[in-house]
From Swiss-Prot:
It is a single-pass type III membrane protein. It holds the Pfam family p450. It comes from the Eukaryota. Disruption phenotype: No visible phenotype and no change in the levels of 13-OH GAs; due to the redundancy with CYP714B1. Cyp714b1 and cyp714b2 double mutants have decreased levels of 13-OH GAs, increased levels of 13-H GAs, including GA4, and longer uppermost internode. It is an enzyme of class 1 (oxidoreductase). Overexpression of CYP714B2 in a heterologous system causes semi-dwarfism and increased 13-OH GAs content. This is Cytochrome P450 714B2. The gene is CYP714B2.
Length: 532
């Protein structure tokens, strides 16, 4: 009898403890997911900054998904009507509008119209401040304090791709990495890489020439894979030197890894689902292990050969860090350089060739410039510097189709910009496309392709952000521009480009803004161009 009573009492105690624990957990979640974000939003409301009303527990996520679904439906209907109409003017570019925001980011467009250039929204318990007011953007870009860092939102989800590399690190860790990597992208070193870039382009040029010869003088191709192969070859040779073939295999796996982590999952972040061995997580973890192993194998094989990977290795070794930490430093920054130097550059090249196919007058101007500057000699660093029209075309491409949709920052401490007080922990998003398409900054022809706008002066710090701005400006922008100018100049000197009737203009946002269905071009030889 006494034993039975003890069991009953023990059971009641356990139930009571479970109830208390459940109540405490519920109270904690309520405070973290609802109360804390509401306090931050209230602080912004006191400053006159509005935004859409969040819902528990996902904030404004449902509104965002609904807006995207509606926009996709409208795009699909427009595409269906266009195909049914089949006016026969394919390749003319009729109907192409250089403003992807209503299709890709429709919720931001609506909220900006409703609440102005500064507004708040939330995803789960994460509060965002969306800023497109030029004076505030300028102040943010001028900030050099380590209290303004990279956004930690979804950092754990992207951990397999970026790790603790320079793209995602903050504070002293970021400053240390930047100092190391910056040396490898000084202008003098970039100049020495142009011959390498020219060599890497030969496979693409030869393939297209052979295709034209086999198809009666014209080919219709989707250029994206060829452009990616070129970019992968360049960055592989730069990073891995003579081991570049293995390097390209690494980059293929990193691209798979990018696809695996490119879809943000707020539920996973809020519930800890990202730690569970579900299919998506297991795929990302396995790819991460493979990439880590392959990079370290190349490090061991490279010996004393000078390449970017070797430079990072030497810097890590001189920092007197533990072996595991040094290995992570090497691997994470290799992946960061891949993402910044391969994927973004390849997509920008595809957009640029699309625009040149759409605007033959600028294609002719660039071709004449390349022929005049090179005068029959191979492209080199000196000739690239003289190609002003080509530079303007690339700059305008980056204005209309910047690879990064946002400049993202996080207030690691309380900060103030342009009179706006920003509480600690708030994520700051600057919409690059909105700044690039502001008629007050760029003029009434803001949605038109007009490289001439870059002919006289450089744009202001707050108005042009394809490589970010301020202390965290992309270190590799000189390298990227050299790579783009090398490839485009070689292609334009050999081929006449025309937008293919198969081209479907549909920008989409993954980790970067890219053509959803690729870029289709019709190619013919330039009369008198040298044949391999």
């Amino acid at each position: 009898m006494e034993v039975g009573m003890v069991v009953v009492v023990a059971a009641k105690v356990l139930v009571s403890l479970w109830c208390v624990g459940a109540c405490c957990l519920a109270a904690y979640l309520y405070r973290v997911v609802w109360v804390a974000p509401r306090r931050v939003l209230a602080e912004f409301r006191r400053q006159g900054i509005g935004g859409p009303r969040p819902s528990f527990p996902y904030g404004n996520l449902a509104d965002m998904r609904e807006a995207v679904a509606a926009a996709r439906h409208q795009l699909a209907e427009a595409r269906r009507r266009r195909r049914a109409r089949d006016s026969g003017d394919g390749g003319s570019g009729a109907g192409i509008v250089h403003d992807y925001r209503p299709a890709v980011l429709p919720f931001y467009e609506k909220w900006r119209k409703d609440y102005g250039p500064i507004f708040t929204y939330s995803m789960g318990n994460v509060v965002f401040l969306h800023v497109s007011r030029p004076d505030v953007v300028r102040d943010i870009n001028l900030c050099v304090s380590l209290d303004l860092g990279k956004s930690s939102y979804l950092k754990a989800t992207h951990e397999p791709l970026f790790g603790g590399g320079i793209l995602k690190s903050n504070g002293e860790a970021w400053a240390h990495q930047r100092k190391i990597i910056a040396r490898e992208f000084f202008l003098d070193k970039v100049k020495g890489m142009v011959d390498l870039m020219v060599d890497s382009a030969q496979t693409l040029l030869k393939s297209w020439e052979e295709g034209i010869d086999k198809n009666g003088g014209t080919i219709d191709i989707k250029i994206d894979d060829d452009i990616r192969a070129y970019s992968a070859d360049v960055i592989s040779r730069t990073c891995f030197g003579s081991s570049y073939i293995k390097g390209k295999n690494i980059f293929l796996k990193i691209r798979e890894l990018q696809k695996a982590v490119s879809k943000p999952n707020v539920l996973a972040e809020m519930t800890g689902l990202r730690f569970f061995p579900i299919k998506r997580n297991k795929q990302a973890w396995e790819l991460h292990k493979q990439v880590h192993k392959l990079i370290l194998e190349i490090v061991k094989e490279s010996g004393e050969e000078r390449n970017l990977l070797r430079a990072i290795l030497l810097s890590a070794s001189s920092s007197k860090v533990e072996l595991a930490e040094a290995e992570n430093f090497i691997v994470d920054n290799c992946k960061s350089i891949y993402f910044a130097g391969y994927e973004s550059t390849a997509v920008t090249a595809a957009w640029c060739l699309m625009l040149l196919g759409l605007h033959p007058e600028w294609q002719d101007r660039v071709r004449e410039e390349v022929q005049e500057v090179c005068a029959g000699q191979p492209v080199d660093s000196q000739s690239l510097q003289k190609m002003k029209n080509l530079t303007m075309v690339i700059q305008e491409t980056l204005r209309l189709y910047p690879a990064g949709a946002f400049v993202s920052r996080q207030a690691l401490q309380e900060l103030k910009f342009g009179g706006v007080h920003i509480p600690k922990g708030v994520n700051i998003y600057i919409p690059v496309s909105t700044m690039h398409l502001d008629p007050n900054l760029w003029g009434p022809d803001v949605k038109e392709f007009n490289p001439e706008r870059f002919s006289n002066a450089q744009p202001q710090l707050h108005s042009y952000l394809p490589f970010g701005a301020g202390a965290r400006t992309c270190l590799g922008q000189g390298f990227a521009m050299a790579e783009l100018k090398t490839l485009i100049s070689l292609i334009i000197s050999k081929f006449v480009l025309k937008l293919s009737p198969n081209y479907e203009h549909s920008p989409t946002l993954k980790l970067i803004v890219e053509p959803e269905f690729g870029v289709d071009l019709s190619l013919t030889r330039v009369q008198g161009a040298y044949r391999h």
